[in-house]
């Protein structure tokens, strides 16, 4: 059985609706995806270029010369985890910014860098809602990782409770808080 396709005018209208609702993090200056191919993405984090696996990249175009500029590549291990293959010397950690926020970046043993830059669209959404609320806002950020959403909400004026089970990630969030100049009061439930 086949369904008739909607007329061209209706398809165009649907596309326009999607475009109006699609959020794009257009304030990045220190992060960009340079290219993608064969299960990998080539990313620029400040002045450092990394190749990381991405299972959603299923197309296989030829990798151009820009891939030769990579400073490091994360290689998965068949036993789980993986490691970074270093092509060029780069810092162990460095700082990037998004709008008025600053973040420590450091490639980890599980392919992450300490930040999910695609979440910036959500940070912008939160900031807009908090800034236009017309009342004090309190936010509970669970599984808060290194604090991107926490810092965005705090920068917009919210009172934020940042929660993550990993002490290492909470410590990293504190570093990001200091880099961004946000005042956060911290405590650890395990210490009380």
Where are these regions (language model features)?
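Conserved SAM-binding loop of SAM-dependent methyltransferases across substrates and taxa
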Residues: 146-157
